[in-house]
Amino acid sequence: MAAGWVLSECGLRPLPRIYSRPRIGFTSKTTNLLKLRELPDSKSYNLCSSFKVSSWSNSKQSNWALNVAVPVNVSTVSGEDDREREEFNGIVNVDEGKGEFFDAGAPPPFTLADIRAAIPKHCWVKNPWRSMSYVLRDVVVVFGLAAVAAYFNNWVAWPLYWFCQGTMFWALFVLGHDCGHGSFSNNPKLNSVVGHLLHSSILVPYHGWRISHRTHHQNHGHVENDESWHPLSEKIFKSLDNVTKTLRFSLPFPMLAYPFYLWSRSPGKKGSHFHPDSGLFVPKERKDIITSTACWTAMAALLVYLNFSMGPVQMLKLYGIPYWIFVMWLDFVTYLHHHGHEDKLPWYRGKAWSYLRGGLTTLDRDYGWINNIHHDIGTHVIHHLFPQIPHYHLVEATEAAKPVMGKYYREPKKSGPLPLHLLGSLVRSMKEDHYVSDTGDVVYYQKDPKLSGIGGEKTE
């Protein structure tokens, strides 16, 4: 059972709300930040008062007038220490440059149509020839890398080959992913053929994954209905044994979860991506699942044949290790597009959730030199909101949409040639993002202080 929990590439079920979010923030250009704190037993009442706050920059005082519903206990805090700021930023983010509060969980003041209108019309145009050129490029590189590695066949070249080839397997996956979204071309048959060839070659059931991924996009940010990398509820988290917790939140184990997720889905959810009668699918999709499973089986049979003809060691070097590098890329990228930001981001349920609010909790990431190799999958916010946009227009579409999204768009940290900075984000998230409350329509990750995130469970 422990294995099942670890091997979950998604999260689980509901993730509840931990802290109550203050809905109203207030600042002054001449004052330091103020902080609302709500006690569990607080009662709301109308406060209409005037008070003064001293400014560090000068001796002048600012008058404040409020006529809002606030918690019974209100504290004004100047010069918060780092620990308090870290806790507070999890709920209401602070724009340090302007000294303004920003509630990431508040409904946005714009609509999905507003974002769509800001994106140039040509960004929606799909060019199948251009899409196929990327397929040709990647396939040539894959076979070229394999030929060069087999030719030199020395232990200096193999590690470099494994990283490069695993990255290229990941690039093939992204192109197949575009086929699944229909952003590859307007021809469903072409999308299906190319998608099957690309995904089957790296042991991914095309239709099975396409359908579950569609569910992820349609329910992004929803604690119960999301399909990929959503959190554990507090009740489920506390029911796990120490070994399971260690495996679930200790690197590198979560980064190896994807193949197992394909077979058994997530804890708390039943179904396989290979079985036509799985709960993931509706009856009319049965034929598609059978087709994809047959293609996957054919690829597996080919690998077995090559294993006997070339030898298991050579196949391990040429295909096996690059495959697991690809899996790590997939889990690494998909996890960090929904986790690991410096500020805690909300998850929703019930009436608080909407397609727009859920999509705005996704994150863009900069991967340096890898951006072009894996087809700009790091431009994830616009991709999540409008998956029909081809990958080669995502950067332009994102730039056009930024002014509309404002603070709801979180500018990614600039990467060096390789995205090594993201390893820190991954480690921090594994240490801090453990579970969410069992109740509440807007919830945030909480941390189990006894769980280290890398070393496993810290017992008292």
Curated annotation (Swiss-Prot):
Keyword hit for Ion transport: no
Chain coiled-coil ranges: none
InterPro entries: FA_desaturase_dom, FAS_N, Fatty_acid_desaturase
UniProt GO cellular component terms: chloroplast membrane
GO biological process: unsaturated fatty acid biosynthetic process
Enzyme class: oxidoreductase
Main location, first listed in the record: plastid
Keywords: Chloroplast, Fatty acid biosynthesis, Fatty acid metabolism, Lipid biosynthesis, Lipid metabolism, Membrane, Oxidoreductase, Plastid, Transit peptide
Pathway recorded for this protein: Lipid metabolism; polyunsaturated fatty acid biosynthesis
One Gene Ontology molecular-function label: oxidoreductase activity, acting on paired donors, with oxidation of a pair of donors resulting in the reduction of molecular oxygen to two molecules of water
Domain of life assignment: Eukaryota
Motif residue range(s): Histidine box-2: 213-217
EC number: 1.14.19.-
Subcellular localization(s) per the UniProt record: Plastid, Chloroplast membrane
Membrane topology qualifier: Peripheral membrane protein
Family: Belongs to the fatty acid desaturase type 1 family.
Biological role: Chloroplast omega-3 fatty acid desaturase introduces the third double bond in the biosynthesis of 16:3 and 18:3 fatty acids, important constituents of plant membranes. It is thought to use ferredoxin as an electron donor and to act on fatty acids esterified to galactolipids, sulfolipids and phosphatidylglycerol.
UniProt-recorded name of the protein: Omega-3 fatty acid desaturase, chloroplastic
